[in-house]
């Protein structure tokens, strides 16, 4: 069940946008601030049933052009919630965004502290979910060393490989090379394409940042499937 869905569903259908918050006080704050497409999960993870409902509401004839925006607290719990949302949402990622409140505040507290405009600004500050997930994972690695850059690529190449839009996949492969500091973007793109060709059960999606760091540091999981070797990272 999504709290606020009855009030928001007409606006969701008209605006082709859904803003997902975590608590019922947050959804009330959003609506009071004029963000009338907000719904809340109220303590449960945003799952497949929620996704199916939202996608039905945002359909416009046979042409999908909806935008799903997750808002999370700026703490570790919010970061993990965003990672779980990505797992639910991998096939829908091109239309998904993440907005993180400053100073670890939830939307209700943010409105009380800074007013209605702060919530509208929060929604406007959204970033693509792929960008958020990749940058979250990269935080767990030291990119100042060749070893850290290789481990970071091993963990994040499978994320980029889940992007079904090939043009977007190529763009994120090149961005990933820049974020990691890898000197040859074509090497990263080559490994993304190789990962994308693997059977689905061989691919690894990020579980949460803590586990991601553990598997990357051990050099396990994708490991040798990521081709750039440390000789290319000076």
Show which residues each predicted segment covers.
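Generic secondary-structure boundary/loop-capping signal
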Residues: 2, 32, 43, 104-107
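Flexible beta-alpha connector loops of hexameric P-loop NTPases
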Residues: 39-45
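Short alpha-helical basic/polar micro-motif
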Residues: 28, 36, 170
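Conserved catalytic alpha/beta cores of large enzymes that bind or transform nucleotide phosphates
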Residues: 1-27, 34, 45
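A charged alpha-helical hairpin associated with nucleic-acid processing machineries
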Residues: 9-18, 47-234
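Short amphipathic alpha-helical segments
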Residues: 31-33, 82-83
């Amino acid at each position: 069940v999504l709290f606020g869905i009855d009030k928001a569903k007409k606006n969701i259908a008209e605006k082709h946008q859904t803003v997902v918050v975590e608590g019922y006080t947050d959804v009330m704050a959003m609506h009071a601030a004029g963000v009338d497409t907000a719904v809340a999960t109220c303590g449960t993870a945003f799952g497949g049933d929620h996704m199916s409902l939202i996608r039905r509401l945002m359909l416009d004839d046979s042409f999908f052009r909806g935008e799903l925006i997750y808002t999370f607290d700026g703490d570790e719990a919010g970061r993990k919630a965003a990672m779980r949302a990505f797992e639910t949402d991998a096939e829908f990622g091109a239309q998904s965004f993440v907005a993180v409140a400053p100073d670890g505040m939830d939307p209700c507290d943010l409105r009380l502290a800074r007013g209605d405009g702060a919530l509208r600004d929060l929604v406007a500050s959204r970033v693509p979910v792929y960008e958020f997930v990749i940058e979250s994972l990269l935080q767990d690695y030291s990119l100042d060393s060749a070893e850290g850059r290789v481990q970071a690529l091993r963990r994040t190449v499978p994320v980029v490989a889940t992007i079904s839009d090939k043009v977007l996949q190529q763009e994120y492969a090149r961005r990933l090379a820049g974020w990691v500091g890898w000197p040859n973007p074509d090497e990263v793109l080559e490994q993304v394409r190789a990962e994308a060709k693997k059977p689905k059960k061989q691919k690894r999606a990020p579980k949460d940042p803590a586990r991601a760091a553990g598997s990357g540091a051990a050099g396990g999981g994708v490991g040798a499937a990521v081709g750039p070797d440390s000789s290319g990272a000076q």
